[in-house]
Amino acid sequence: MSLSSSIEWTESTWNPLTGCTKISEGCENCYAERLTRRLQAMGNPNYANGFKLTLHRHVLEYPLRWRKPQTIFVNSMSDLFHKDVPDEFILDTFKIMKQAGWHRFQILTKRSERLLKLNKVISWSPNIWMGVSVENQDCTFRIDHLRTTNAVTKFLSLEPLLGPLPNLDLSGIDWVIVGGESGPKSRPMNPSWVVDIRKQCQAATVPFFFKQWGGQNKKKTGRILDGEIWDEMPIAKEIQGFRKRSLVAGVGFEPTTFGL
């Protein structure tokens, strides 16, 4: 778990599981796999198994120890809905998020079929934002699955954007993130794809967040689109009283860095 994240749309990360397997084109140049190799070489004990799917039960209760409210990206180094993650572990993760109601949790998955299957038994709460990753037209079915869930806030991560996404159905969607692929083998993103998605979001009054152009040097390419930085966020749907009550009831200590 890391207190400070370099991901532009979140504040912290929490990884009760690490490692994954590839299921679609967006996985080809997985940043988490590259980072895992580095962390393993550094001797980080959570990455002793490399990129093999690994559950870290000792990490589950970390959010309960963070007193200060945080926006937390869940499983930045894996996918909570991977087929090899036991149902019980997934449900326990959601229970912790509900209990830690003073935080806001952001979850992304490419495995929307399993999300849909578990939807009715998940302990949803307003502080849990659920999202799906969609890299091209072939993966837009994930949006339909997400729309069917009982998540209060639903969002899309269109990263790495590998093709145009015309005629998106944004009904029931609260937020859209767009980003290009970064890294040594990154595939290019056409600016016209980004502009079109932004226009669709504006027409549907859905907040639009442009994360990056990507490429081999993402800092150099930046995140300016048409002369602006697009940092739009959804209106928080959390019940403030719920968050305050949870903070009073929470136990723990001031946040610190627990590692990835």
Predicted features and spans:
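N-terminal [4Fe-4S]-dependent radical SAM core
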Residues: 1-73, 79
